[in-house]
Swiss-Prot record:
The gene is dxr. Its cofactor is Mg(2+); Mn(2+). It is an enzyme of class 1 (oxidoreductase). This is 1-deoxy-D-xylulose 5-phosphate reductoisomerase. Mn(2+) binds at residues 147, 149, 218. GO terms for molecular function: 1-deoxy-D-xylulose-5-phosphate reductoisomerase activity; manganese ion binding; NADPH binding. Belongs to the DXR family. 1-deoxy-D-xylulose 5-phosphate binds at residues 122, 148-149, 173, 196, 209, 214-215, 218. It catalyses: 2-C-methyl-D-erythritol 4-phosphate + NADP(+) = 1-deoxy-D-xylulose 5-phosphate + NADPH + H(+). Keywords: Isoprene biosynthesis, Manganese, Metal-binding, NADP, Oxidoreductase. It comes from Chlamydia caviae (strain ATCC VR-813 / DSM 19441 / 03DC25 / GPIC) (Chlamydophila caviae). Pfam families: DXP_redisom_C (PF08436), DXP_reductoisom (PF02670), DXPR_C (PF13288).
Length: 379
């Protein structure tokens, strides 16, 4: 039985993780739950259902309410709570289902204790990939990707000779704006952007999908996750989102992972690997006609892929800078302060003018994060 701490349990990934746990109760025990958002009612229901021994929240009102209603549970507040949840002695696996870098210190401390990291938070590797990889190597920490694309690549690479790998290919649905003209893109609304044709996700990641920044961040994540220095990492548009990742080998053979567009598949794999169990979710119905289309990314319309390649060339502080600047620009769009087309325009300008520095500690990461947020708010 695996003993889990779920960081970000009330978000989309967190709730789907608990759905998998609910379907396979004999395999898991939830030791700790941490919530970042305002989804208080959902969090209370999770506490009642899964009876964790540790919970963490980010607002004082919830802290006092939980302490009163659940007197036998250890309740923590803020970053202290994340650390307590992630490093609890009974926990052997951390599900990093939060967004942003707020959980980064807790994740690193858990890795130092040898706990397995089931990672859904791409910002962690984008901002601190070099640090995370060094800690994973030093402490022999296992990292299992939950992102559907990286989980697919992980499955394709498992047991393979990585020196024979030629290319890693991440697939992109193309987002809600795939078929809009350049003229239409200048007039898109928040409502247009948040209507994703395939995936049901949070607002921030849905905006990132529309700009393909999400795919750019995933290219960076794949670099740090798999460490294949001699393999090319690319992205292709695949509107059906049935194939999630492909590995091309030196002999031209391509392996892929194929399943319906649901995060339940990679979550269950990450939680149960190397074993496989019956799933509550259905696979692809091959008795029905299926279409698979692949298009190259239009990098003129979507410079985000080029920005990701820039980060991989420059490394250092460029990753945390790109990540934090994008977060601010997306938030400015969601509050109707800037237009959708401004996100990529401003992000490109910020990256063009940024002078990369070394980034070898968490203090460095958070300093760059702060600088990027300030610049992205002003531009």
């Amino acid at each position: 039985m695996k003993h889990l701490a779920i960081l970000g349990s009330t978000g989309s990934i967190g709730q789907q993780t608990l759905k998998i746990i609910r379907s396979l109760p004999h395999l898991f025990k939830v030791v700790a739950l941490a919530s970042y958002g305002n989804n208080k009612d959902v969090f209370f229901e999770q506490i009642r259902e899964f009876s964790p021994s540790i919970v963490s929240v980010y607002d004082e009102q919830s802290y006092f309410e939980i302490s009163k209603e659940f007197p036998n549970i250890e309740v923590f507040l803020g970053e202290e709570g994340l650390l307590a949840a992630a490093t609890a002695g009974e926990v052997d696996t951390i599900v990093a289902a939060s967004s942003g870098v707020v959980a980064l210190p807790a994740i690193i401390e858990a890795m130092k204790l040898g706990k397995t990291l089931a990672l859904a938070n791409k910002e962690v590797l984008v901002s601190a990939g070099e640090i995370i990889k060094e800690i994973a190597k030093q402490y022999q920490t296992r990292i299992l990707p939950i992102d559907s694309e990286h989980n697919a690549l992980y499955q394709c690479l498992e047991g393979k000779n990585t020196s024979e790998v030629k290319k890693l290919v991440l697939t992109a649905s193309g987002g809600p704006l795939l078929y809009k003209s350049k003229e239409d893109l200048s007039r898109v609304t928040i409502r247009d952007v948040l209507k994703h044709p395939i995936w049901n996700m949070g607002a921030k990641i849905t905006v990132d999908s529309s700009t393909l920044v999400n795919k750019g961040l995933e290219i960076i994540e794949a670099y740090w996750l798999f460490g294949l220095e001699n393999a090319e990492i690319d992205a292709v548009v695949h509107p059906q989102s049935l194939i999630h990742g492909m590995v091309e080998f030196q002999d031209g053979t391509v392996l892929s992972v194929m399943n319906p567009p649901s995060m339940l598949f990679p979550i269950q794999h990450a939680l149960t690997a190397p074993k496989r169990y019956p799933a509550p979710h259905k696979g692809i119905d091959f008795s029905v006609k299926q279409t698979l289309e692949f298009f190259p990314v239009d990098e003129e319309r979507f410079p985000s892929i080029g920005l990701a390649r820039q980060v991989l060339r420059e490394k250092g502080s460029s990753g945390p800078f790109l990540n934090a600047a994008n977060e601010v620009l997306v938030q400015r769009f969601l509050t109707e302060e800037i237009a959708w087309c401004d996100i990529l325009d401003k992000l490109t300008r910020l990256m063009e003018n940024y002078r990369v520095s070394s980034c070898s500690s968490l203090d460095d990461v958070f300093a760059v994060d702060k600088e990027a947020r300030a610049l992205a708010q002003e531009i």
